[in-house]
A protein has these predicted regions:
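Structured beta-strand segments within beta-sheet-rich domains
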Residues: 142-168
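Extracellular disulfide-bonded cysteine-rich modules/repeats
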Residues: 40-43, 166-174
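The right-handed parallel beta-helix/beta-solenoid scaffold, focusing on the short coil/turn
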Residues: 6, 23, 40, 50, ...
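Exposed extracellular interaction/assembly regions and N-terminal maturation sites
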Residues: 56-144, 148, 173-197
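Glycine- and small/polar-enriched repetitive beta-structure motifs of secreted/surface proteins
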Residues: 1-57
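Short beta-strand-initiation
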Residues: 37-39, 65, 98-100, 165-167
Length: 197
């Protein structure tokens, strides 16, 4: 390294091609960043990790009152519906490069209104999986609602009553290009109804 700063190179010949790159972590024999001037990269062996997660630390919880478009960098976070109406738009998974990205959603606001999770591409992207619904104004009777590939559903709506109210939690995981898996438990009042559409 001739002028690069704050780099960590561990292993024989690790980072030996770096000249001006800053803030890189390179581990392993002959491992190098993507270029001699790359910044902010983590390379273990010959694999570059653009988003590293340190296990054992807390993940962020974000309360939201407005429409929000998520990115792959938000993966692992918990998002809380903290208002009558808000829409979370998932990142577009059409390129197939965000497999494994996941988000947790919790409804905290208990008023009627449209709280929604939706795919970025409503034509090509689909939600598959199921949720269990618990009717909170009877004996906690349960019902299940499934979303199959053939259904071509692309959004989940919590309406504050029959399709989800405060206490509902859903996890959405990208499993392939244009495919998101959904699992969770929703609380409802009245006659349980599917949150998928």
């Amino acid at each position: 390294t001739s002028t690069g700063y704050h780099n960590v190179f561990l292993g024989a010949n690790a980072g030996d091609l770096n000249t001006t790159g800053d803030n890189n972590i390179v581990i392993g024999y002959n491992a190098d960043a993507s270029s001699n001037s790359a910044d902010n990269e983590i390379v273990i062996g010959n694999t570059s990790h653009t988003n590293a997660r340190v296990y054992g630390l807390r993940t962020p919880v974000t309360a939201t009152t407005a429409d929000t478009t998520l990115t792959a960098n938000d993966s692992g976070e918990t998002f809380v519906f903290n208002d009558t109406a808000a829409t979370f738009t998932l990142p577009d998974s059409g390129a197939g490069d965000i497999t494994g990205v996941y988000f947790h959603f919790i409804v905290l606001d208990d008023t009627a209104g449209t709280k929604r999770i939706q795919c970025a591409d409503s034509t090509n992207e689909d939600l598959i999986g199921s949720v269990r619904s618990v009717d909170t104004d009877t004996s906690d009777a349960t019902a299940s609602f499934a979303s199959q590939v053939s259904d071509e559903f692309h959004q989940i709506t919590f309406d504050g009553t029959t399709t989800g109210r405060a206490g509902s939690k859903v996890t959405v995981t990208n499993i392939a290009a244009d495919k998101w898996h959904v699992e969770g438990t929703i609380l409802c009042t009245g006659s349980p109804a599917t949150p998928f559409s």
